[in-house]
Amino acid sequence: MTSTACGINRRLGLSALALSVAIGLAGCSGEDFTEGGELTRLASVPSGAEITGIYLSEGGDLFFNAQHPSDANAAPFDRASVGVLVGVDVNDLPTSFKPSPVPRTAEERQQVLTALGEYQVIAQEGDTLDGAVPAGLGMTISRDGSRVVKASNDPDFNGFVPTREDGSAGFLFTNWEDRPGGMSRLEITKGGDGRWQVLDAMMLDFGDVDGT
């Protein structure tokens, strides 16, 4: 595998399982996939949850979601989360680092654990975000706006569209995978401390096609 292909593989080929179990730091070095580096666990999600929406930006920000966690978890991870790994440039990871621990205690099993940086929750299912999303994030409402027809805890695909050249601001789109499903759009900006802030939010109107 060429170095170019390896780079593309690392940027776009990360699966949910790969992140929850491990990220390969040198796994592309072998010519026939029989040689390569070890795998190192970067993050794990709370009990009942699935990692979805893995998106690595050009600036090294790794967005991912904790989909459908157990509602028995302690807050905040009793609700589905759209979030990002802060405090680390994933495009410039060290050659080796201590892996994220395997969750063993009851407390650890109810958290997002990371090897590097910290998982920041940007928004969660049901958040109204200062009234910008009156029915709540992830909620699909009827065409006349009178009722919620589906309350989703399944944030899936993420896509980040930067509005600044350095990638420190933009729109984060998240598909809420359900029947019917929906899509949220969060306008976000990164502060000097590396943490993200929501400036505006909305659920996109897919009423004409009966949801996503």
Where do the protein language model's features map onto the residues?
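N-terminal secretory signal peptides that target proteins for export/translocation
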Residues: M1-N9
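Sec-dependent N-terminal signal peptides
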Residues: R10-S20
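Exposed regions on extracellular, virion, or secretory-pathway luminal proteins
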Residues: G13, S29-G30
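C-terminal motif of bacterial Sec signal peptides marking the signal peptidase cleavage site
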Residues: G24-G27
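Sequence/structural signature of beta-propeller domains
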Residues: G30-T212
